Structure formats: structure tokens, C-alpha cells
């Protein structure tokens, strides 16, 4: 038998080792009987839970899940409030419980941080509501049928509205755009009546490191205060529940035939269905490269408005249908039906002989409700982008004959826009931040004077998205991924497209392409795509070189393949591009900074002198006779 033979071999090995050394092992203090293999019993009629264990019981491995740990922390905080009404002592009890669970290895200190206090508040409200509903149900009639389950589910949307800051405080008006890492919505604050832009980023499968990186970068963005940077107001995190099918099996439905590959790759929340995305942060919508591959990597339509409507019909286990809509490019309404697997907590009969057979049902993968984090970033509303301005300039340039009669083509206007852009880039580079996705769509013109505002910073956690995002197409071939190539094709530097390391000089390449587009009107989109693509090979339009030689020179310098040879934002501000006006402004800014430092130093010296004088006066008062 295996157990006996293994023990015999082990004894022979020990004996050989002892003989080689020449030492005799001392007799054991307690002589235990030799272990033999367990006798075999006929357990065919014994329930599985009562059968004899033949191996040590393996403890289940609990994978680190931020959402689960946040819920556990919220439960601890809720219990602390229930058992200790005093707010101060309740807070102390909560901290003590967290420390205890951290020592036991059940929690991470990260999930107990104050950054998630608002999220825990939402959990506590939901827990309170759930307890009240359960208590009312038990008090009414505990022996009734399961019809109350449908009532509880019908309250899910209302409960989400009660615990959502976004739904409570803001009225969503329209969608402004789809970025690489989320969607931006135009909203109105219900309290002050002002309009804002809120970017919603769906975080899927977040780990501790990922969440810390997101929070750290949000804090960095909050510290950016500059006239040429989109104003940042606040940020918060909420829980959202998304119905995701683990491994979707293609079902032959007529409604699925009209769906494109791009639409079929995401569900109603824009969550990717690729299996490799489970171990990394996944943001709503597709990656920038996949999103822009059909427009900005080739030819981009000026009137390109991505609006889709798709109807998702979700079969609930009670037989009800839940519908959600999303617009499609051609404006048509399409339907997609997903059959949800049964919930283990609720007994149900989920068979239908008319619509599908048992074999079809067994082929479907179970669908689970996953809870993800949604990051909300409230920003200043800027509706006019530089892309819109350039498109209008190109249209008017075809109509205007005299440049003086067409301010959109005037060099002075383009120079003013480019100067403010470079000043904003100089500021963020001075703060140690690389934008990584500078393009006309991410640059805005605000107010009547059309002040330049740089926005839509590509979060560095986008690198986390791309680590394991090796998507696979339908036919099994590897789909193009972005990896570390963050940016849009026409404006991204060569090192970004090659996936190598990049720094602030990568932003300067994008600045060079934007400089060319500001001073070179295009008649067609094909012409624009050809010219901007030719810049990579060092080809500058002859018309630009003749009309604006200084701008053409710096376009050539900024788009060099060697990143170290590109001028910095500071060098641009000190160049002849702005006829020394930028240099004067920069000098004044540096003087103001120096003066502020001197003022701070003088304040410190004055405070020290006042303290010294106070000590001297006290000593003198002590020496005076009574």
C-alpha cells in the first residue's frame, strides 16, 4: 500500500543517512505505534458530508477582493454604531475592531482608510434598509410564499438612488464624450443650479495597489491650480452592480446579428468581457486605441458623434425582464437577450420547453452579479474643444478669401491659443506630471475670450489596465492592444506607439503635431490624415514653411524621433514663436514666485523676532522689583 511503502522508503533513507554520518539516533522519549494505512470502508451508502476524511482538511483560500473587504469594514462600522450610540466612542470601537481584524489577517489596513468613508456610509445606509425590510417581512408573515422576493428586487434601483451621491445631488443632462478610461457627462447640481462635467470611471477587479494608485493620482489632479488647466472640484467613489456573464457562449438570436464586434465586446456598462481583464483595473468603455482606430488613426469625421442605443433584455429568475437602452451608431434600436443563471439563495424553476431545451440551458454559463467601484471626478464644464475650433476654422478657411476678414485663420489667434497651451503644459511638467494624451479633443476653449484649458488627463493607472489586457478576437487571433502605448495614433509619439518608456518629451511631440494643425488649414479629412502622418517621416507642408517659417521650424524640432532632441515647454516659451511676449510673461511669473518665497521667508523671520522680543520682555518684567 502507498502509505506503508512510503514509510518504509523513508526509514531506509534515514538509516542510510545515519550510517553515512556514523551516529546512532537516540531512542524516542515516547514510543508511538507504527502508522498504518486507514482501513477501507464501504461508504457507498454514506452521505458525502459524513464520509471519513482521508487527508487533512484544506482551508479555503480567500482571494483579496477590495469590494468584499470594504463591505466587511462597513459591517464593522455599522455594528459599532449599533452597540455604541456615542459617536466618539463608536469611532474608537470601530478602529479597535479594524485593528483586531487586521492582526488576524482578515482585513487590510488599506480598506479601513478614511478615503473610503463615503463608500462605507452608502453601505451602512443599505445595510440599515435591508435590515428594516427583513424585519418587516418576518413580522408580517414568515410563512408566506416567495412573492416578496420580486418586491425586494424592485427596490434595488430605488435603494441605489438613495445611496448614490451622483443620483442624489446631480441631474444628468447629456453625454459630452467617451474617453479612453470613462465617460464624461454634463450635469446640473440640484443645490446650486450650476453646470459641471463629471467623468465616471468604472474600476473592475481592483486590487489594493490599483486603488491606492487611483486615489493618489486623483489627489495629484486636485492640486493642479492653473488658468490653463480644467478646474477640478471633487471626486468620490461609489459601488455599482453590473450583471456580467463569466464566459459568454454565442447564442443564435436574430437580434445579435446587427451588433458589431465593438458593440458585442461590451455590456451596458461598457465592461469588457475578456477573461484576462479579471486581474486588472478595467475602466468603462474600450481602450483609446480600439476606440479611435477607425477615426483618429486614419480619417476622423468632423461631425463624429458616438451615440448608440442598444436594448439589453435581462431575464430575471422570477421571469421578469429588465430593459436598458444604449444608442447605436446607425440610430437603430437593437435587442440583446441574456439568460441569467439561477441564484443559489433562492429556489426557482427556470425551465422552458417552448423556448429552449435542457441542452441549450446547460450550454449557458452562469451569470453573476458583480459589484465594482465607480470613480466620479467632478470638473469644470468646458463644452467647446480645440477639435471643434479647428473644424470650424477649416470650414471657414475654405470660404474666406481675405485673412483679415476671417479671424479663424489669423496667425495671431492661433498663436494666442498655442501660447496658452504651452503654458499649461509647462505647468503640469513642472508638477512632475505627464499628460500622455494631448490632442485637440482633450484641449478646451472656455469663456468669451476662449481661454485654453487642458483636460482629460490620462491616469497613470491606465498602465495597470493594459498589463493583462491581451484581448482575443472572435476568430482566435490576438486583437491589437495598447500595452503602454497611451495616446491617440496621430498625436502619440513614436516611443508611445512602440510601447517603450516615455516622459515629458512625449507630450512635446503631441504639442508639435497640434502646432502644425493650428497653423495649417485642411480642406479634407484625407488631407489632414496624410499630412499628420507624414510628420513622422519629417515631411512638413511647403505651404506652412513659406507662410509660417518659424512655426514650421519648431514643428520639425518637436516631432523628432529622438525624444531627447525635442525642445521642452520652457524652451518653447523662451523662443521666437511668441515674439518675446511669452518670455516676458514667464519672467514675470518667475519673479512672482520668487517674491512669494521672499515674503514667506520674511514672515518666518518676523515671527522669530516677535517671539524673541516676547521672551526678552518677560525676562525684564521678572527682574523689575515689586
UniProtKB/Swiss-Prot annotation:
Site features described as Heme-binding, chain residue numbers: 83
Record PROSITE patterns: PROTEIN_KINASE_ATP, PROTEIN_KINASE_DOM, PROTEIN_KINASE_ST
Positions of the UniProt region annotated as Disordered: 1-37
Phenotype when changing residue 81 to Q: No effect on heme-binding
Reactions catalysed: L-seryl-[protein] + ATP = O-phospho-L-seryl-[protein] + ADP + H(+); L-threonyl-[protein] + ATP = O-phospho-L-threonyl-[protein] + ADP + H(+)
Biased composition (Gly residues): 1-20
Residues engaged in binding ATP: 176-184, 199
Chain positions of HRM repeats: 405-410, 547-552
Motif SIFI-degron location, chain numbering: 88-107
PANTHER family: EUKARYOTIC TRANSLATION INITIATION FACTOR 2-ALPHA KINASE 1 (PTHR11042:SF160), EUKARYOTIC TRANSLATION INITIATION FACTOR 2-ALPHA KINASE EIF2-ALPHA KINASE -RELATED (PTHR11042)
Role noted for this protein: Metabolic-stress sensing protein kinase that phosphorylates the alpha subunit of eukaryotic translation initiation factor 2 (EIF2S1/eIF-2-alpha) in response to various stress conditions. Key activator of the integrated stress response (ISR) required for adaptation to various stress, such as heme deficiency, oxidative stress, osmotic shock, mitochondrial dysfunction and heat shock.
Stated name of the protein: Eukaryotic translation initiation factor 2-alpha kinase 1
Record organism: Oryctolagus cuniculus (Rabbit)
Amino acid at each position: 500500500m502507498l502509505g506503508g511503502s512510503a514509510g518504509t522508503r523513508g526509514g531506509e533513507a534515514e538509516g542510510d543517512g545515519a550510517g553515512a554520518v556514523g551516529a546512532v539516533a537516540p531512542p524516542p522519549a515516547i514510543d508511538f505505534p507504527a502508522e498504518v494505512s486507514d482501513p477501507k470502508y464501504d461508504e457507498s451508502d454514506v452521505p458525502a458530508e459524513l464520509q471519513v476524511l482521508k487527508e487533512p482538511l484544506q482551508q479555503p483560500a480567500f482571494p483579496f477582493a477590495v469590494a468584499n473587504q470594504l463591505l466587511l469594514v462597513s459591517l464593522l462600522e455599522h455594528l459599532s454604531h449599533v452597540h455604541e450610540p456615542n459617536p466618539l466612542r463608536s469611532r474608537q470601537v470601530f478602529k479597535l475592531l479594524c485593528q483586531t481584524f487586521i492582526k488576524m489577517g482578515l482585513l487590510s489596513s488599506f480598506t479601513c482608510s478614511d478615503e473610503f468613508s463615503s463608500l462605507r456610509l452608502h453601505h451602512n445606509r443599505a445595510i440599515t434598509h435591508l435590515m428594516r425590510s427583513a424585519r418587516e417581512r418576518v413580522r408580517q408573515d414568515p410563512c408566506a410564499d416567495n412573492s416578496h422576493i420580486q418586491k425586494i428586487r424592485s427596490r434595488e434601483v430605488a435603494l441605489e438612488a438613495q445611496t448614490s451621491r451622483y443620483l442624489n445631488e446631480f441631474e444628468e443632462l447629456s453625454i459630452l464624450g467617451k474617453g479612453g478610461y470613462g465617460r464624461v457627462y454634463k450635469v446640473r447640481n440640484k443645490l446650486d443650479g450650476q453646470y459641471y462635467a463629471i467623468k465616471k470611471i468604472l474600476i473592475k477587479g481592483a486590487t489594493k495597489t490599483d486603488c491606492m494608485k487611483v486615489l493618489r493620482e486623483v489627489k495629484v489632479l486636485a492640486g493642479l491650480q492653473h488658468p490653463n488647466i480644467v478646474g477640478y472640484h471633487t471626486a468620490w467613489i461609489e459601488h455599482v452592480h453590473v450583471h456580467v456573464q463569466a464566459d459568454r457562449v454565442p447564442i443564435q438570436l436574430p437580434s445579435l446579428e446587427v451588433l458589431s464586434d465593438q458593440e458585442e465586446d461590451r455590456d451596458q456598462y461598457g465592461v469588457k468581457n475578456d477573461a484576462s481583464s479579471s486581474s486588472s483595473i478595467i475602466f468603462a468603455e474600450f481602450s483609446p486605441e480600439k476606440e479611435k482606430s477607425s477615426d483618429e488613426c486614419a480619417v476622423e469625421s468632423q461631425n463624429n458623434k458616438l451615440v448608440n442605443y442598444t436594448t439589453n433584455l435581462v431575464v430575471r429568475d422570477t421571469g421578469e425582464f429588465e430593459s436598458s437602452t444604449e444608442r447605436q451608431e446607425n440610430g437603430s434600436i437593437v435587442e440583446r437577450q441574456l439568460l441569467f443563471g439561477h441564484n443559489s439563495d433562492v429556489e426557482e424553476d427556470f425551465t422552458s420547453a417552448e423556448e429552449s431545451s435542457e441542452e441549450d440551458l446547460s450550454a449557458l454559463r452562469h451569470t453573476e452579479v458583480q459589484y465594482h467601484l465607480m470613480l466620479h471626478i467632478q470638473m469644470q464644464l468646458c463644452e467647446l474643444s480645440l477639435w471643434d475650433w479647428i473644424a470650424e476654422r477649416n470650414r471657414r478657411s475654405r470660404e474666406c478669401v481675405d485673412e483679415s476678414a476671417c479671424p479663424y485663420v489669423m496667425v495671431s489667434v492661433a498663436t494666442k491659443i498655442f501660447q496658452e497651451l504651452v503654458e499649461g503644459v509647462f505647468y503640469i511638467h513642472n508638477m512632475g506630471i505627464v499628460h500622455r494624451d494631448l490632442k485637440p479633443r482633450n484641449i478646451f476653449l472656455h469663456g468669451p475670450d476662449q481661454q485654453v484649458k487642458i483636460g482629460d488627463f490620462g491616469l497613470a493607472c491606465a498602465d495597470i489596465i493594459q498589463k493583462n489586457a491581451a484581448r482575443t478576437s472572435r476568430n482566435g487571433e490576438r486583437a491589437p492592444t495598447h500595452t503602454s502605448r497611451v495616446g491617440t495614433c496621430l498625436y502619440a509619439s513614436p516611443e508611445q506607439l512602440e510601447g517603450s518608456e516615455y516622459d515629458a518629451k512625449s507630450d512635446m511631440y503631441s504639442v508639435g503635431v497640434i502646432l502644425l494643425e493650428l497653423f495649417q488649414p485642411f480642406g479634407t479629412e484625407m488631407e489632414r490624415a496624410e499630412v499628420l502622418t507624414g510628420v513622422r517621416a519629417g515631411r512638413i507642408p511647403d505651404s506652412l514653411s513659406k507662410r509660417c517659417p518659424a512655426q514650421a521650424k519648431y514643428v520639425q524640432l518637436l516631432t523628432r524621433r529622438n525624444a531627447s532632441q525635442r525642445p521642452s515647454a520652457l524652451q518653447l516659451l523662451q523662443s521666437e514663436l511668441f515674439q518675446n511676449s511669452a518670455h516676458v510673461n514667464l519672467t514675470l511669473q518667475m519673479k512672482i514666485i520668487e517674491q512669494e518665497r521672499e515674503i514667506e521667508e520674511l514672515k518666518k523671520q518676523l515671527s522669530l523676532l516677535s517671539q524673541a522680543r516676547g521672551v526678552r520682555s518677560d525676562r525684564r518684567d521678572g527682574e523689575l522689583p515689586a
